[in-house]
């Protein structure tokens, strides 16, 4: 309600993004009748150009051999993609451990998100076709490296927020039954 009664009651706003959901206006308190929205879809042919692979055979995160098994799987995947990998991790520890291990095992250039500022790093990866980029949450959205430079995206764990996060708990309590659809 505050956005509707505040800045957007005085000025027109045009929002564009690849990730803004059509339900966003009601989430921020705008009257749905006052909003024009359009979803233009994606130009990417997911059905013919993408493959989802879930390594269900890996040990659970709590099991002792998990890291070794993840590194073995990651090595196979990176070799299959001839480098050209964006590997995303939910912790810095996991990112650095995997990057150290892949640097030792593979001949491909392995960049880490803390090697350079974000845009310089994306440029460096884009300029070297077989390079790999290992990163954390800051790279889960908004990274675009056109062409064949990145052909594989690996995510070590789905980045669900901690269930005991106090801010998220308060938001869930406020929203009620539909909080999973609206927040999580």
Briefly describe each language-model feature range.
Residues 1-184:
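ASCE RecA-like P-loop NTPase motor cores
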């Amino acid at each position: 309600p505050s956005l509707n009664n505040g800045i957007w009651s005085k000025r027109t706003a045009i929002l564009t993004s690849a990730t803004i959901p059509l339900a966003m206006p009601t989430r921020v308190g705008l009257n749905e009748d006052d909003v024009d929205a359009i979803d233009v879809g994606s130009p990417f042919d997911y059905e013919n150009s993408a493959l989802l692979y879930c390594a269900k055979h890996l040990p659970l995160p709590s099991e002792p051999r998990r890291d070794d098994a993840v590194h073995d799987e990651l090595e196979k995947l990176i070799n299959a993609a001839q480098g050209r990998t964006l590997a995303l991790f939910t912790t810095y520890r996991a990112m650095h451990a995997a990057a150290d291990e892949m640097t030792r095992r593979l001949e491909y250039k392995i960049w880490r998100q803390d090697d350079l500022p974000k845009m310089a790093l994306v440029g460096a990866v884009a300029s070297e076709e077989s390079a790999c980029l290992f990163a954390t949450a800051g790279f889960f959205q908004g990274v675009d490296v056109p062409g064949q430079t990145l052909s594989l995206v690996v995510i070590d764990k789905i980045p669900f927020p901690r269930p005991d996060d106090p801010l998220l708990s308060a938001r869930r309590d406020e929203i009620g039954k539909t909080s999973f659809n609206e927040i999580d």
